[in-house]
């Protein structure tokens, strides 16, 4: 019992010494710097994002925002080992599975946050 208490106490002392805390000025600087970085990244992402749909089903695309339609997504198909992306709505030949797939596509489009 005493040995386990000594081991725990020693571990805590080592942890306190090994991980010194930052002073408040350094912490404030880190927060400001990280907020500026996040704001820059968000602005860049918003600028690079397509604003409206421009492709119909069957046409080549690079992301979901380019495809027109609530259930149309930019899907990947591999032909001879090469990835080809095109706008697609149909997910299955089975009618029931196709409806479920289109619902999943609609959720995926909503998550894409296209303007």
UniProtKB/Swiss-Prot annotation:
Residues 19-51 form a propeptide. Residues 1-18 form the signal peptide. Contains 4 disulfide bonds. Keywords: Disulfide bond, Secreted, Signal, Toxin. One of its GO terms (molecular function) is toxin activity. Expressed by the venom gland. It is found in: Secreted. GO terms for cellular component: extracellular region. Belongs to the neurotoxin 25 family. F7 subfamily. This is U7-theraphotoxin-Hs1a. It comes from Cyriopagopus schmidti (Chinese bird spider).
């Amino acid at each position: 019992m005493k040995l386990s208490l000594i081991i725990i106490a020693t571990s805590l002392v080592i942890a306190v010494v090994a991980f010194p805390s930052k002073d408040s000025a350094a912490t404030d600087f880190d927060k400001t710097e990280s907020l500026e970085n996040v704001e820059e990244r968000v602005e860049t992402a918003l600028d690079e994002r397509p604003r409206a749909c421009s492709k119909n089903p069957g046409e080549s695309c690079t992301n979901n925002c380019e495809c027109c339609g609530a259930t149309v997504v930019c899907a990947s198909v591999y032909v001879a080992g090469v990835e080809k992306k095109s706008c697609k709505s149909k997910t299955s030949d089975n009618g029931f599975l196709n409806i479920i797939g289109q619902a999943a596509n609609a959720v995926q489009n909503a998550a894409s946050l296209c303007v």
